[in-house]
Regions:
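Structural alpha/beta core scaffold segments of enzyme domains
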Residues: 1-211
Length: 214
């Protein structure tokens, strides 16, 4: 009980705040390419045209990928074991963008300066669509976030992309209505909590080393 209501320092706290641990970016090979993503400026839109010709001419640019270059095979970002309860709703790059900051193109180059320049030279023409901006109104709205036919859910968790539902469910213990009838006072309300992330602070990062360098 001596630890209850007492400040307990994490074992790695001092190392973290003084920058001693090694992160992925600290072990980048000298010849590693720099990759950055062109982000959508629209909350909901479909890419009508995307031109990377001028951007590809920037010295040092090795590759530019758009939705036309990636597999049309959806996957989930969930971390659960297979079969995941979260829907398979993501593409590496999608023709439809669903929020400000959604990925539009991936640029790889030899220097960060070259990649930044190329990002500014990619020309994108959008068909801007009405967006779902209020989660209270999202369910059964006329605007579908995922209207595509190859969206799927592997588990029966009440997911339905035609209703903007990634999952639905309820849990009840006992006769709730009967208990409420017997209460002298009943307080009803809608409550929200902030988003929480229980995982590490570092974002997803990967270095790929070709077989020739192994």
């Amino acid at each position: 009980m001596k630890s209850v209501n007492a400040p307990i320092m994490k074992k790695d706290a001092m190392a973290l705040v003084t920058g001693k641990p090694v992160y992925t970016d600290d072990i980048a090979p000298k010849d590693c390419l720099v990759c950055k993503i062109l982000r959508s400026q629209h909350a909901h839109a479909v890419i009508e045209e995307i031109n990377t010709d001028i951007a590809m001419k920037v010295p040092g640019i090795e590759c530019i990928l758009t939705y036309e270059d990636v597999p049309d095979k959806r996957f989930t970002m969930a971390g659960q074991t297979y079969p995941e309860p979260s829907p398979y709703d993501r593409l590496i790059l999608d023709r439809r963008v669903r929020f400000v900051g959604d990925a539009v193109a991936i640029v790889a180059g030899k220097t960060e300066e070259a990649v930044e320049k190329a990002l500014k030279l990619i020309k994108v023409k959008y068909e801007v669509l009405e967006a779902v901006l209020d989660f209270h109104q999202a369910k059964d709205a006329k605007i579908l976030v995922h209207p595509e036919e190859n969206w799927k859910a592997l588990c029966d968790v009440g997911a339905d992309n035609k209703r903007n539902l990634c999952a639905t469910g309820s849990e009840q213990n006992g006769d709730v209505d009967k208990i409420l009838e017997d209460c002298d006072y009943v307080v009803e309300g809608t409550y929200h909590t902030q988003a929480n992330q229980q995982a590490m602070m570092e974002t997803f990062r990967t270095y790929k080393i070709g077989r020739a360098h192994v």
